[in-house]
């Protein structure tokens, strides 16, 4: 009987999906990971893969889908069964051997992957469609196209979600793949530890990072200024690339804007494809909230969703955090979620007019942060390229986004002559015409200075 039910399992799930109008996201999130573990005495034991769903979701699956599953099984098998659920991590030792990762690298990688960060739960919009398409292409054909894949964008916009999605997809398609996801901070810390224990660990460190199929390294900008880390990563990159292994990198800015990055690393980062993620527009923000509502099994009024999407515009993390805060306040006060409650929950996040006033100081703050300089250096007489170029970009943006005259901009930026400001603005305009991709840097900065609805 077990073999029959296993054979018919996909048919059972499809029947349930259609009969009870289960959405595609819920189907893939809660039902597809269920597997027939055992059948005995008219009881079917279904294993819940807690590496994908999470052990805390077991009660939800029981309450939501037990009766649906019993009905679907009876319809397809023509026999009544009771349903029990077991966590995959608690099943027999031999079952564990079959389902767990076959090597240390995979086990370690899985421990750092968020089970909810998959392509199925990633909301695609105009702000991220190229990054999503490139990530999926790399996941489907590692090291065949776009190597390396460089994903950049601001905090909380979905870079890490895409990287985890790539790792999950590759491991699902080929469980024997050696996939390693790390942050640049972890890479640096492990390098430091290997140097401290020079008798044993340098070889282990290199073996770990160079004997793999896919390397995903998050927030690469944090290796800036760390010469030894850049040196080690340079050789790691070369070894993997020459061996036709896939490399995926994320950062808060494109390679050409990481001014203190070694040129040899910058050029290698640009060998493949560079894609960006921008702040989501209103429609995408609504879709993100709807997806979170579904995944968290919530029921939220559309007016509340519209209120959040209209007022929280900066990034996905804050958007989802706002919804979580509203739901938490609702449970604490035992009140229904409505716009009045939402206003109370988000009063510290939303001012009556949350649109930023664009000032010269704000522009310089954003530009200096983007190019990893300080505001004092922008105002200073330092003429090195690492400082002068961001200064010229700040001048250009001040002219574009404020009503300040060239003379006023010059005075406020260290008593510079208006001709100096004009020269800086003209240089930036020429660079935009010469390198169209530079326009994207300007667009990113403008978004940071004053995000549009």
Curated annotation (Swiss-Prot):
InterPro entries: AAA+_ATPase, Chromosome_initiator_DnaA, Chromosome_initiator_DnaA-like, Chromosome_initiator_DnaA_CS, DnaA_C, DnaA_dom, DnaA_N_dom, DnaA_N_sf
Region (Domain I, interacts with DnaA modulators): 1-79
Region (Domain III, AAA+ region): 112-330
Chain positions covered by the region annotation Domain II: 79-111
GO BP, one annotated term: DNA replication initiation
Keywords: ATP-binding, Cytoplasm, DNA replication, DNA-binding, Lipid-binding, Nucleotide-binding
Stretch list, region Domain IV, binds dsDNA: 331-453
Membrane-traversing stretches: none
Binding site for ATP: 156, 158-160
Listed NCBIfam families: DnaA
Cross-referenced PANTHER family: CHROMOSOMAL REPLICATION INITIATOR PROTEIN DNAA
The protein's name in its UniProt record: Chromosomal replication initiator protein DnaA
Gene name for this UniProt entry: dnaA
